[in-house]
Amino acid sequence: MKRLRLIVAAALLALAGPVGAQRPAGVVPAALPLPAPLAATDSGQVFSLTDLLTFVALRHPVARQAGLLPERALQEVRYARGLFDPAATSKYYGKTFGGKDYFHDWDSQLRVPLWFGADLKAGFDRGVGTYVNPESYTAPAGLSYVGLSVPLAQGLLIDERRAAVRQAQALQGLAEAERRGALNKLLLQAAKDYWDWSLNYQRLQLLDRNTGLANTRFEAVRQRVVFGDLAAIDSVEALTELQNRQATLAQARVQFRNSTLLLSNYLWNEQNQPLELPAAARPQVLPGPAAWQPLPPDSVAALAELAQRIHPELQKSRAKLNQLGVERRLLSNKLLPKLSVDYNLLQAGQPFSPESPASLNGNYLQNNYKLGVSFAYPLLLRQERAKLQLNRLKLRETELDLQQDTREIQTGVRTVANEWEALREQLRLQEQVVQNAERLRVGEQIRFENGESSVFLINSRESTLVSARVKLAELQAKYAQTQATLRWAAGGVE
């Protein structure tokens, strides 16, 4: 187990990736108050992924809504425990007609439900009058009693009250799993949108520099055409390339603005008012070669085991099994007959109290009591047996769902881990492609300056280079998203 903890810890450190990296100067702080970074930013200020996830976890409406689930479950437990609240009742019925007192019945009782199924009772009865029911008649001083009502078959081991409490307690685990599941999905999507925003920013920077190079080349070619060093068609070639790059840059600028707006959907203040990400805010850099680390040995198996224990979907299924298990015990108990015994110890006059203790000897107990026994039992039990069978079917369905979900989650962890390793290899190869494209561009530039190349070839080399760099940025963003996805697949992003 200790070795498993070490493996999981190492895996989570590797999964932290760029999220846990040290922030550069000017980074928006994650500490509260959170709205400060969004109130005013200066050029180049970084809004990091940690800042975004902090905003989302604390203030996003979905996160706040998910935070209400445990409180609802707590109130369900309180409601169920209310079934064991003591209850005081008092009833009085009297009749006087024609100046004659027919009867006066007064019944007051305190009933305290006990956890093991019995009810503790204490009360005072007084029934007097000319026509009072003999069953209710007492001496003028009244009759006090203490007693116990105990089920001896159905309701002895479990009853509706205890089942309601147990199911409400299981609901707490279900609510916590639902809260974590909803928050994890929200944080995962926020992380993916953040890296899309970072990718669009990186693409915009690359295309802006590429357009600047095309503009510089166009001006230089135009001057050389004026001086007669190049043919006029070369200036047309340079201008066409510049216009193409300007169109591509405009599209990239729109994509960046749209991704900025999309990211703003996650930003809310303490008053539940939406916030806008300032135009000057910039994302943290995409993960570089230093972050392209392999997963620690045995980490995939450790993460799969971790997911099996803490994944919200599996915890929800286990909580449902607990609830169904409590229901099965209750329904099985319903097959027993209803047999209960009521015993009340009686005393004339005021209720039992330490100031006037009764002499509870054997003779008193034998001559001052009220005893009742009740019995009921359905002959066919069709309803009870059908409900129990339905419960068993639900249990089996939930167990099968748990098995399937466990298999899918473990497969999901391994699938994302495979994508992680594949992306590492793709990143390494793409970095080499960028380096080779840079060498080709530099070589073509030298050939052009020596009069051995053309504007068309220079533009072609630059287009190949910028395409390679954009693809590298896309792989970097996908790598960062895969890190977040692996954390989610293992059971949590928060």
Regions found by a protein language model. Name each.
Residues 21-103, 148, 152-163, 167-169, ...:
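Bacterial Sec-pathway N-terminal export signals of envelope proteins
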Residues 34-44, 91-150, 281-296, 328-333, ...:
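Small/polar, glycine/serine/threonine/aspartate-rich low-complexity segments that form flexible
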Residues 225-232, 448-452, 489:
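A short glycine-centered flexible hinge/capping loop motif at secondary-structure junctions
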Residues 1-8:
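Bacterial N-terminal signal peptides that target proteins for export
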Residues 64-68, 81, 115-141, 153-178, ...:
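Sec/SRP-type N-terminal targeting helices
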Residues 23, 176-303, 419, 423, ...:
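Periplasmic alpha-helical coiled-coil/stalk elements that build and connect Gram-negative outer-membrane
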